[in-house]
Swiss-Prot record:
It comes from Xanthomonas campestris pv. campestris (strain ATCC 33913 / DSM 3586 / NCPPB 528 / LMG 568 / P 25). It is a single-pass type II membrane protein. Its main location: membrane. This is General secretion pathway protein N. Residues 179-200 have a biased composition (Pro residues). Signal peptide: none annotated.
Amino acid sequence: MRLEMIGLRTWLLATVVGWALLVCVLAVAGLGKRVELLPDDPALVQRLPALPAPAPERLGPFEKYAEIAAHPAFAEDRLPHPFFLSGNDGSGAASTVRLTGVLLTSTFKMATLTLDPADSVRVQLGGDAVKGYRLLALQPRSATIEGPGGTQTLELQVFNGQGGQPPTAIGGRPQAPGAVPPLPPNVPPAPATPAPPPAEVPQQQPGGQAPPTVPPQRSDGAQEAPRPSDEQMRAIRERIEARRRQLQQQRQGGSTPGQTQ
């Protein structure tokens, strides 16, 4: 067979088979079994960088910061003051709180605080905070509280007799005979009221019939209610007496069976 007649595909397959046989022979001969590390070369070893010396401790012990807390740097008097997140100094909140009530017993202690004219809270000693206020100590006329304005001692406010509205005068209050009520200051006296005219005596009309009785009128123009006559008063008394006798008989009739047993 001539070489010119062999195709390209045949040459490609023959090349692959030849290389495969070569690799198999080398593997059987021990190819790759004697892989070893090269000896160390001192010239190739790089020098490690030197670490800098440790710096001294900058923060220092925690005890040093106690002086900063005792003498704050941003305070004008270098004294500690309460810190407010709202941005105010708390004087407005502290000035509006007033102690208006104290309740002291052997087992219960409570104080009433007035925050504004329309709002008040009740805080109990040893209890939870109410609207940011907590009761720390309570005395008969003072209380120590902790709130947005810090810790403060409030004195119990009592009425000193000044200000407020005067008591309402009662119209039907009896007065001593001959007593004259005092006039308010800077008020002119009321003009004298003319005496009412005497009541006219009803005249007997011809025929023996009395004229109709006209109820007397008061000075203010209102008519007075007619008074009951003697016959009406007598009839009312008789009804009351009859009712009393009836109740007495019923009471005696109900107690008689119990007495006979």
